[in-house]
Amino acid sequence: MVGKRLWVTGYRAYELNVFGSNDPKLKVLKTSLKNTLMQFLDEGLEWLITGGQLGVEQWAVEVALGLKPLYPDFKIAMMVPFTDFGKQWNEDNQGQLAALRGQVDFSDAVSQAPYQQPAQLQGYTRFITIHTDAALLVYDPEFPGKAKWDYQAAEAMADRRDYPVQLITMDDLEETAQAMAEAENEHFQND
């Protein structure tokens, strides 16, 4: 049981070489996220809490929004570290962030100031781990990325209290891709 509030984070899009919504890797990632979230929802998950980073965090929001018709009580929160989060992004990415923030049930900045110092990022991570019951990361320690810091923070919280940390690793993604390919092959054989 992951509890009622789940923090979802992981790799940035560029770390996975996913560039665009039609990338086949994205379908695998979203399928894996969907399957895991549905399992947690069936166990009593109420809130998905994530940030707005380009990559797993935004994809998790997209997947969660797609699950809301099946789980009408499911809530989504997008918390960003500071008020001007994403301002350095190109116009399309800023628009995507704004659109997602407009669709979730709750969105706010942890620090009510523009970016000033790295301590705001540490404060954000501390806030998220304190206000969630478990973490789900699309992350593999054998393939480090920026989510390494989130993984370390989640593991540190797990050392202090009951805080399950579940990873979707590269092997898990490979298994999902194989299952999807097998299902597609069966579909074509039955036609």
Swiss-Prot record:
<comment type="similarity">
    <text>Belongs to the UPF0398 family.</text>
</comment>
<protein>
    <recommendedName>
        <fullName>UPF0398 protein LSEI_1479</fullName>
    </recommendedName>
</protein>
<dbReference type="Pfam" id="PF06908">
    <property type="entry name" value="YpsA"/>
</dbReference>
<dbReference type="InterPro" id="IPR010697">
    <property type="entry name" value="YspA"/>
</dbReference>
